Amino acid sequence: MAAGSACGMFGSWASAARAAAKGEKLYDLPRAGNVSFLHFTDCHAQLIPIYFREPSVNIGLGIMNGRPPHFVGEEFLKFHKVPANTALSHAYTYLDFEKAAKAYGKVGGFAHLATLVKKMRADRPNAFLLDGGDTWQGSATSLWTNGQDMVDACKLLGVNMMSPHWEFTLGAKRVEEIVQKDFAGKIEFLAQNVKTTDFGDQVFKPYVIREQNGIPVAVIGQAFPYTPIANPRYMVPDWTFGIQDDNMQKVVDEVRSKGAKVVVVISHNGMDVDLKMASRVRGIDAIFGGHTHDGVPQPVLVSNPGGKTLVTNAGSNSKFLGVMDFDVRDGKIASYKYSLLPVFANMLPADKEMQALINKIRAPYQAKLQEPLAVTEGLLYRRGNFNGTFDQLICDALMEVKGAEIAFSPGFRWGTSVLSGQTITREHVMDQTAITYPYTTVTDMTGEFIKTVLEDVCDNLFNPDPYYQQGGDMVRVGGLTYACEPGGKQGNRISDMRLKGQPIDPKKTYKVAGWAPVAEGAKGEPIWDVVETWLKSKKRITPRALNLPRLIGVQNNPGMAS
């Protein structure tokens, strides 16, 4: 079931890296069945190798406490039986991040991912390559090419099927153009839960059935259910979304009735939602999940009225490739083997054809991408339930440039990391901000309304029912301090809000800066311009002091760094 302990012989980051350079066995993975899937998700348009720090806070509550994906650091290693100070422990956790990153180098990059895909397909020539979505957004080149860079890269990579989320922020017209023209006859764009608002017609194919080694296999797509809530509704005005368990059951029953012996779902629900769906819908063999960026080494086996379903999640940023082998005998799955392989750029040579495409894509923008803006003296990262240091930088820039007392920055999970001592380039800033609605805003808000905003976002993150978790991580906050009780009741999780040590007055008005408004017609200076202005004025960026809330009731949670 596990990705294995292939690097267990390593005793330190340095010795592990030296052994890896000599050719360790991480990627020696013989086929273990007759139906295979390769899965990546949430690459967020990262074509070149990057640094990416995994979260130190990923809190699970209620039934989600103490089960994947809500483990971090040492608790993660303990639960998943991953040896410390190894390639795998670096890939899966934040532990000693900078030290390990310098030892192992960058991760991901489509040229290195392509090499790994080809290596896995050499032993699995008919394996399906699944793309879990959030592929066409997240970088400067994806924004500037309207997603074309990633469309071309995915075609060359050999993707067979995908399901969407951030793709919809390019707008319905652009999505349909890509599906109907670029993907025609090449990549299946699947979403059983996207329908027209007028008659409820299916907008995209809900599934495909294809044979692999003579065995009929159904692949069903599940788009992010809350796209019109988490992202601008006006970009997809004529389509409805939602989880749609009942429709999923109908689709599963339909493909089974058509003879499918293996049924899998490419899902962008998020792992907690997938776990609940797996407990309710019968007949799914595996859910290949995304959205929550959880690199989970082993599948979770979930019981339901019809049997059992495997649930996986394959991380983000082209940092991982999931490999699932099913051994199908007499029309049933007799056994399976799953591995979540980290993509270390120093261990996998760049595929020449993919590298040539990437070079071609980036060439017109290279000077613009690499323009130096400042040097950071501390590690910059985003991922985690609460403020990351790059988010703190964005909040600090918003408050100073816009003259605001308080700043809010969205709790996006995407965004690469920058090591201390590195030059911050325009590309790094775009990695944090490249969206189609980048407008900054300055709004007068009462203390009462500020609390309402924080409570609403907090409920989206920590609602005890996964089906009501409708967004990303907690909104990032600058200037304002507060306490948060994740396990509290709706409307009562936020307390002790203060500005410069003084309690927030519910009736008083405060000047609040933010960005990424979802309302139609919003305008304002793009966030990347604000951040660039601030960085250039500073030249050297001192380590950011994280404005983290005082957390209540989660002291022993395995999703909290010790």
Tell what function each PLM region has.
Residues R67, E74-E75, F79-K81, T86-Y92, ...:
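A short C-terminal boundary segment appended to hydrolase-like catalytic domains
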Residues P216, L379-L380, T481, P503:
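Short, solvent-exposed loop/turn motifs
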Residues A111, Q148, K173, D246, ...:
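Generic alpha-helical secondary structure signal
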Residues T115, K119-A122, E177, K181, ...:
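Charged/polar, solvent-exposed surface patches and flexible loops
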Residues G4, G8-A345, N385-A397, L461-N463, ...:
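Acidic, metal/ion-coordinating pockets
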